[in-house]
């Protein structure tokens, strides 16, 4: 390393300065050697310049004929010049409801900016925020308005309300659609939620609306449709938030059929339907059922030993349920301390 902090050495032993282009004489040597027929890799070894640097310089020279380096340091040229900023402030002051992209289009239409040197939408928004802070205006005056809502209000002679401030309020104007316009837009939305540019153009002509307004209307209408569908789905699944998937069991489903030795249920009072979380599964088999080839039967029945009406116990002989590979210890755990029956034998079903 030579001259710390100034020069660095590449893998070929050549010195270079970080962040600075090659000197012009070195560039001229690269071009002369390339014109004489030398390959870039040989030029790289002779001049001790990296192969990538040689290839870039030659490629740019063959493409544009320019040998000098591009601009050194700095940033991109500022597009929001003082005249442009002043015009942006003037447009926003005259029409506070203007979008940033509308201001951008107006700047191009007036010839103040060329197509390739127009401030971006984010740059215009930054200018508006800076003007708002400098002038101390309320945030609603210079803020870029949100998208137009597809609101259907009273009929209006024009497609849009005149742009301007509401006296005494900081609210922006909304587009007002006549009933015929709203009906045409809604009918097209029912045919397809994503109309192409041709369909939007025809609809804009038929409704006397700007095509941008039609596009924004469809965007907002799709968002409204998604909200409605989500609400409809949530209304259909009231227990989805708790993760409940077992349906409620009405008292009439609870069977009074009993197995030998089970507690009689005829004297139990009628109960309101209980939630799915208020039922537990317990298995009980009588000795004679252990000899059968059919799975044990289960039924949902309220548990009266627990001191409440929340936890029902399963009594046999109600609902046929296949219970594979259940051993006695697991069955005893499922029955808990209910004391309804003591399983002693359990068969295994495939």
Swiss-Prot record:
Protein localization: Nucleus
PROSITE patterns given in the database record: HOMEOBOX_1 (PS00027), HOMEOBOX_2 (PS50071), PAIRED_1 (PS00034), PAIRED_2 (PS51057)
DNA-binding region listed in the record: 5-131, 170-229
UniProt-annotated stretches for the region PAI subdomain: 8-64
Span list, region RED subdomain: 83-131
Gene Ontology CC, one term: nucleoplasm
Alphabetical keyword list: Developmental protein, Diabetes mellitus, Differentiation, Disease variant, DNA-binding, Homeobox, Nucleus, Paired box, Repressor, Transcription, Transcription regulation
GO terms under biological process: animal organ morphogenesis; brain development; forebrain development; regulation of transcription by RNA polymerase II; retina development in camera-type eye; sensory organ development; type B pancreatic cell differentiation
Effect of residue 45 to W: In KPD; uncertain significance
Region (Disordered): 153-172
Region (Transcription repression): 278-350
UniProt main location, coarse: nucleus
Pfam family of the protein (one): Homeodomain
InterPro entries: HD, Homeobox_CS, Homeodomain-like_sf, PAIRED_DNA-bd_dom, Paired_dom, PAX_fam, WH-like_DNA-bd_sf
CDD domains noted in UniProt: homeodomain
Entry keyword DNA-binding: yes
Molecular function terms from GO: DNA binding; DNA-binding transcription factor activity, RNA polymerase II-specific; RNA polymerase II cis-regulatory region sequence-specific DNA binding; sequence-specific double-stranded DNA binding
Disease per UniProt entry: Type 2 diabetes mellitus: A multifactorial disorder of glucose homeostasis caused by a lack of sensitivity to insulin. Affected individuals usually have an obese body habitus and manifestations of a metabolic syndrome characterized by diabetes, insulin resistance, hypertension and hypertriglyceridemia. The disease results in long-term complications that affect the eyes, kidneys, nerves, and blood vessels. Diabetes mellitus, ketosis-prone: An atypical form of diabetes mellitus characterized by an acute initial presentation with severe hyperglycemia and ketosis, as seen in classic type 1 diabetes, but after initiation of insulin therapy, prolonged remission is often possible with cessation of insulin therapy and maintenance of appropriate metabolic control. Metabolic studies show a markedly blunted insulin secretory response to glucose, partially reversible with the improvement of blood glucose control. Variable levels of insulin resistance are observed, especially in obese patients.
Role, per record: Plays an important role in the differentiation and development of pancreatic islet beta cells. Transcriptional repressor that binds to a common element in the glucagon, insulin and somatostatin promoters. Competes with PAX6 for this same promoter binding site. Isoform 2 appears to be a dominant negative form antagonizing PAX4 transcriptional activity.
Family statement: Belongs to the paired homeobox family.
Protein name as it appears in the record: Paired box protein Pax-4
Source organism: Homo sapiens (Human)
């Amino acid at each position: 390393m030579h001259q710390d902090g100034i020069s660095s050495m590449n893998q070929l032993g050549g010195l270079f300065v970080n962040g600075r282009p090659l000197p012009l004489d070195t560039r001229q040597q690269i071009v002369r050697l390339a014109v004489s027929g030398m390959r870039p890799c040989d030029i790289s070894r002779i001049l001790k310049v990296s192969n990538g640097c040689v290839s870039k310089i030659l490629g740019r020279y063959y493409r544009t004929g320019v040998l000098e380096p591009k601009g050194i340091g700095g940033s991109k040229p500022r597009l929001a010049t003082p005249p442009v900023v002043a015009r942006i402030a003037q447009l926003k002051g005259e029409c506070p409801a203007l979008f940033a992209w509308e201001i951008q289009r107006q700047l191009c239409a007036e010839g103040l900016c060329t197509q390739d040197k127009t401030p971006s939408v984010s740059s215009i928004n930054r200018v508006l925020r800076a003007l708002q802070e400098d002038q101390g205006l309320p945030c609603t005056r210079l803020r870029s308005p949100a998208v137009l809502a597809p609101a259907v209000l009273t009929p209006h002679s024009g497609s849009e309300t005149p742009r301007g401030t509401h006296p005494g309020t900081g609210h922006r104007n909304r587009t007002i659609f006549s009933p015929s316009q709203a009906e045409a837009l809604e009918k097209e939305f029912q045919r397809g939620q994503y109309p192409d540019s041709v369909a939007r153009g025809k609809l804009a002509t038929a409704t006397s609306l700007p095509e941008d307004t039609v596009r924004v209307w469809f965007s907002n209408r799709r968002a409204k449709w998604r909200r409605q569908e989500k609400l409809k789905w949530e209304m259909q699944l009231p227990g989805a938030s708790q993760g409940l998937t077992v349906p409620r069991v009405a008292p009439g489903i609870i069977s009074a059929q009993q197995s030998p030795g089970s507690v009689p249920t005829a004297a139990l009072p009628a109960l309101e339907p209980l939630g799915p979380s208020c039922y537990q599964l317990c298995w009980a088999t009588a000795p004679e059922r252990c000899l059968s080839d059919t799975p044990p039967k289960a039924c949902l029945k309220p548990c009266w030993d627990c001191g409440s009406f929340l936890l029902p116990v399963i009594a046999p002989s109600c609902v046929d349920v296949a219970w594979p590979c259940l051993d006695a210890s697991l069955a005893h755990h499922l029955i808990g301390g209910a004391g309804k029956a003591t399983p002693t034998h359990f068969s295994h079903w495939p």
